[in-house]
Amino acid sequence: MSEVETSVEKHVFEADVAKLLHLMVHSVYSDKNVFLRELISNAADACEKLRYEAIVAPELLGSDPASRITLTLDEENARLVIEDNGIGMGRDELVESLGTIARSGTRAFMERIEAAQNKDGAQLIGQFGVGFYSAFMVADNVDVVSRRAGTDKAWHWASDGKGSYTVSAVDLADAPARGTRITLHLMDEAKTFTSRWTVERIVKEQSGHVPVPISIVEKPGAEPAQVADGTALWTKQKSEISKDDYTDFYRGVAGQYDEPALTVHFRAEGRHEYTALAFVPGSKPFDLFDPDRKGRMKLYVKRVFITDEAELLPRYLRFVRGLVDTADLPLNVSREMIQESPLLANIRKGLTNRVLTSIEKLAESDSEAFAKIWENFGSVIKEGIYEDFERRGQLLALSRFRTTADDDKPRALSDYVKEMKEGQSAIYYLTGDNLAQLKASPQLEGFRARGIEVLLLTCPVDSFWVTTAPDFDGKPFKSITQGAADLAGIAKNDDAAAASPEAGAAVTDFVSFARETLGEAVSDVRTSDRLTESAVCLVAPEQGPDRQLQKMLQDAGRIEGAPKPVLEINPGHQLIAALATCPSEDKAFREDAVKLLLDQARVLDGDRPEDPRAFAERLSRVFGRALKE
């Protein structure tokens, strides 16, 4: 040990890292190869960060400007070394980067990784960005020696993955001139990763398109042999790129191990020139519903990585992975310039249009592939209906919805409009949390009796976009839980064609009595033409949000003093008929019955009785009376 390396700091991993390392060491993954792709990806990132910092500080490159990644195989000592000449790390960066997981989603990762076991393990590693720790899948000890470019100190990080790690200074003679060297002391069952054939195959399959050349040193002291030339895939002609090439590149840029559901590769020419390579993932990224809703498209200038925070796509396309490369921006572009640049505004518009158009074409040419994309990302795309006024019509046409149609398949609005009933002037919808509960909703009864299709909307964003999208193809959207149903002008199906019962005088009197009894608990009580089987239901008044949106806003504390619901009564229901003919002098019983009807409507609406104790007492009194008769 050198004199410099006499002071050794010992640190304990934070709890989440310790747990993660335990999972890695005990290897819940069947595919061990993933560790190499992760470490190469980290090395390539380090090289690109150096290229970026060297724009304003070219002295960082010294006399060695060319980026490279070198893999050294040491079969005799069962070691694999991954070395890059990138930006490198200082002491604090080593502790921060390798001792903690400084990102959200770790707990969710733990839960999923433990549940997954061998299933989908490789994909989870990339999804959660914990690639370095995958080294412990194959190594029982890991040494990291790093020297940050432009500094005169080097540092050694070491761990056996059992709960702690050490950090110490190291002689410059024992460190890279700049960059990072990772030495994996391989487990007995992982010694195959010192085989030239094995490592070269993995590199070509998984990392052949990283924008940094990769070489293999077959044994210590041997000459390096290049196995990947660092050519940027997106600069090639599409005719030169195979499907496997695209898949390998996607896995690198997206950090996922599935296959892309859709690839969009184009070059825009004219006033502004840029190349874009974008992928729609084959599965949901873990951070799809992260509150920050950040995109992951990377911005390159002349093949130099600049940032992945340029917001090159709207938030409702945040699941798209890939990059844009342009030569029309300066390499030292600032964050402010990125936000204000007319070029980037043009890129955002062009890229968004191309991605949406490509998804539309897929919907026409391969409905099965599109259905998978919609299943994974439809709830996110629909955010755009609410947020993107310019493309609202396009997004509505692209969207698919569950409906009351017999085939139970997601439907396009264009198909819905084509099959509207004679006399139907609106697109009807019902919002809620649960599809099964929506299908059992009493508010649907009158629509089913007339064969009117109703959209069943279960995504939280559905309750918002329907309030901002005025219509589709000239047909307004109308909630079946808000205002009057106005179904009288639409004929019922033959099997439900019996005339709707008129509200007789007794029912009219009972409605008035119910209105008086309930008072301010409801905004109104009225007979309904939307009910055919149930006795009662709740709907929202004509003005204000529908029932589901009102609940969401109240739960979030966004509204106070919301309008009370309307209690609708089915005049043809035998219970209503019996109550309507109940002697008026039996007022206490009738009041109990009316309040029980309101609680029944609340339960049918997915709520609970407002006062459970009073509900139970009323129920007992009504049961008691019934048993005496």
From Swiss-Prot:
What SMART domains does its record include? HATPase_c (SM00387)
Query: Residue ranges of region A?
Result: 1-335
Q: Does the keyword NADP apply?
A: no
The protein's predominant localisation is cytoplasm
GO function term, MF aspect, one: ATP hydrolysis activity
Instruction: Give yes or no: UniProt keyword ATP-binding.
Output: yes
UniProt keywords (A-Z) are: ATP-binding, Chaperone, Cytoplasm, Nucleotide-binding, Plasmid, Stress response
Cellular component per GO? cytoplasm
| Chain intervals for the UniProt region annotation (B) | 336-551
Subcellular location per the Swiss-Prot or TrEMBL entry: Cytoplasm
Residue ranges for the region (C) are 552-629
- What family classification does the UniProt entry report for this protein? Belongs to the heat shock protein 90 family.
Q: Which HAMAP family match?
A: HSP90
What binding partners and quaternary form does the record give?
A: Homodimer.
The task this protein performs is described as: Molecular chaperone. Has ATPase activity.
What is this protein identified as?
Chaperone protein HtpG
Native species: Rhizobium meliloti (strain 1021)
* Chain's gene name: htpG
